[in-house]
Amino acid sequence: EAIYETLHWEPQVLVCAQSNTAVDWISEKLVDRGVPVLRIGNPTRVNDKMLSFTYERRFESHPAYPELWGIRKSIRETGSRMRKGSYSEREGMRSRMSRLRDRATELEIQINTDLFDSARVIASTLVSSNHRLLNGRRFPTLFIDEAAQALEAACWIAIGKADRVILAGDHHQLPPTIK
């Protein structure tokens, strides 16, 4: 509820927890209320209901992805032909590959921007908040759920990305466990 209320005055928040299960549970509740969530982390550790909200799935379903996939395929094919061509042919192919790489980078940036701009909640585990996709991103508010079970060192990873931190959880729960 606190996350939902905070979204009335903030454009985006970061929501973290120690476990994937907790992150998925919170994310599901928000999705059920119509909040756009972008789930960051290893898709193999995300529950089935939240898979379609993972960065990887949303990236692949973006309208610009087929063009990006085609460009990447052209880059691979051009690279293969380059190894077999003469010097003058390789020079032309290098120029083509450079243009293709530039366009691929533009598309990747566009897709990333679209995905992050459309999400009101970025959800990840505390450790996954250090994912390269979140590098350089700041959030007005960070919610840490299951804070009583979170390892302090893991909390600091996410805390560095936020201006304000809200800790939530039952202090009567079990202490942090190290696996």
What are these regions (language model features)?
Residues 120-121, 141:
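Short, Asp-centered acidic motifs that coordinate Mg2+ and/or phosphate
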Residues 1-112, 121:
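ASCE P-loop NTPase motor cores of helicases and related translocases
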Residues 8-11, 19, 33, 113, ...:
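Conserved helicase motor core of SF1/SF2 NTP-dependent helicases
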